[in-house]
Design a protein with these regions (language model features):
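Short, charged recognition helix plus adjacent turn
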Residues: 64-78
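A detector for short, charged/polar N-terminal pre-domain segments
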Residues: 1-6, 73-76
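Residues within helix-turn-helix
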Residues: 23, 34, 52
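DNA major-groove recognition helix of helix-turn-helix/homeodomain DNA-binding modules
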Residues: 49-64
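Short basic helix-loop element that most often maps to the first helix and adjoining turn
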Residues: 9-28
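Conserved hydrophobic/aromatic packing and binding residues within compact polymer-binding modules
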Residues: 11, 25-26, 36-39, 65
Length: 78
């Protein structure tokens, strides 16, 4: 999973957890809804300032939007 996919997944999850629509998030961030949609579909890469702005609105750290999911531990072979 590349960093755009990681960001897309975390952005969507954080937005939904906060209970915001793409439209509401875009309005608060001062950007277009279609840009939020494209970010959530891994179509565009966000600038550092956009990542920071979105994180602030979502109430998370910017780094949280870039964190890869933890890998599940593998079951030991018997």
């Amino acid at each position: 999973m590349d960093i755009r996919e990681v960001f897309a997944r975390n952005l969507r999850r954080s937005r939904q957890t906060k209970g915001l629509s793409q439209e509401a998030l875009a309005h608060e961030a001062g950007i277009d809804r279609t840009y939020i949609s494209a970010l959530e579909r891994s179509q565009y890469s966000a600038s550092i300032s956009t990542v920071d702005k979105l994180a602030t609105i979502l109430g998370v750290e910017a780094a949280d939007l870039l964190k890869r999911p933890a890998k599940a531990p593998r079951a030991a072979k018997t």
